[in-house]
Amino acid sequence: MAIQSKYSNTQVESIIAELSAVLDKHQAPTDLRLMVLGNCVTDLLARKVPAEARASVAEQFSKALAQSVKG
């Protein structure tokens, strides 16, 4: 069963394109891109998710990421 998102594909793809353009501008190799994006996720969790929910949200995020790369 597909997961329904409250965000449109257009909105998501637009943000991805902008983030990718910034990484391209800096000629960031794959490992640096992953490091930067991971640090962004960590910062977002620290600033926007209550402390008591962070571990759970991080776990859900990591599971979704792992599932998305399985194809």
Curated annotation (Swiss-Prot):
Annotated S-S bridges: none
Native organism taxonomy: Bacteria, Pseudomonadati, Pseudomonadota, Gammaproteobacteria, Alteromonadales
One Pfam family named in its UniProt record: DUF1414
The name this protein goes by in its record: UPF0352 protein Swoo_2786
InterPro entries the record matches: UPF0352, YejL_sf
Transmembrane segments: none
Superkingdom, taxonomy of origin: Bacteria
Family: Belongs to the UPF0352 family.
